[in-house]
């Protein structure tokens, strides 16, 4: 478990999985899924390797607070994104239930999923995705791989219903303070003084607080330094 890997804290990010739909299943869906994902899918001949299901998904959105009240900035995202490669894909955080592996990692635009290069994101202050591509081994769980394929079909009850989630381990963080509903940290006030961070940590959701300061502004945890 990640909690044993010498990090003090963990946070969870999640995102809908987008599969590459085989053309023999539905050629229109196959075309739509290719347009969305082409830049991130591993290069695999799925006709020859019909037991492999290529997938892609956003591991997290950089520079935007997640629902747990945590955020990763551009610098940390760029330092860690390649670490996802060759990691397992699990079902529901069950480490013994590995159904595939991650093979590619890159960046895409927030809201549109258009591929971005390292150069394009390096100086970005606004939100962007860290996007991963990988494979699910259909043979391990046929029912699940069918569900993943159906999740890109708007007429299916499984549409947008399969998510990947990631537990990230870290030991260091600063605080960011935002007003109202704002989730993007480009206009946040950052608190990096260790004494001040410690004084306010009980306000954080990750430590059982309400995520608010006395003046009504919202306080979040910005993950820094090494992330596993």
Region spans (language model):
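Polar/acidic, low-complexity leader/linker segments enriched in S/T/G and N/D
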Residues: 2-98
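Generic hydrophobic, aliphatic-rich segments that mediate packing or membrane embedding
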Residues: 85, 102-106, 128, 162
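Surface-exposed intrinsically disordered loops and tails
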Residues: 21, 41, 46, 114-117, ...
């Amino acid at each position: 478990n990640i909690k044993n890997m010498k990090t003090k804290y963990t946070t969870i990010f999640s995102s809908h999985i987008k599969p590459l739909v085989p053309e023999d299943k539905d050629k229109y869906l196959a075309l739509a899924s290719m347009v969305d994902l082409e830049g991130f899918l591993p290069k695999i001949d799925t006709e020859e390797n019909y037991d492999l299901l290529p997938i892609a998904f956003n591991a997290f959105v950089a520079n935007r607070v997640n629902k747990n009240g945590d955020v990763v900035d551009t610098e940390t995202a760029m330092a860690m994104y390649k670490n996802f490669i060759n990691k397992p894909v699990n079902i529901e955080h069950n480490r013994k239930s590995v159904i595939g592996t991650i093979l590619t990692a890159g960046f895409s635009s927030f809201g549109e999923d258009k591929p971005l290069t390292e150069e394009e994101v390096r100086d970005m202050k606004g939100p962007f995705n860290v996007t991963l591509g990988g494979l699910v081994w259909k043979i391990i769980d046929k029912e699940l791989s069918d569900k993943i394929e159906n999740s890109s079909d708007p007429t299916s009850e499984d549409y947008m219903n399969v998510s990947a989630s990631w537990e990230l381990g870290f030991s260091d963080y600063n605080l960011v303070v935002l007003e109202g509903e704002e989730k993007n940290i480009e206009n946040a006030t950052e608190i990096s003084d260790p004494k001040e961070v410690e004084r306010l940590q009980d306000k954080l959701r990750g430590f059982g607080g309400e995520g608010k300061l006395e003046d009504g502004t919202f306080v979040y945890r910005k993950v820094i330094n090494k992330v596993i």
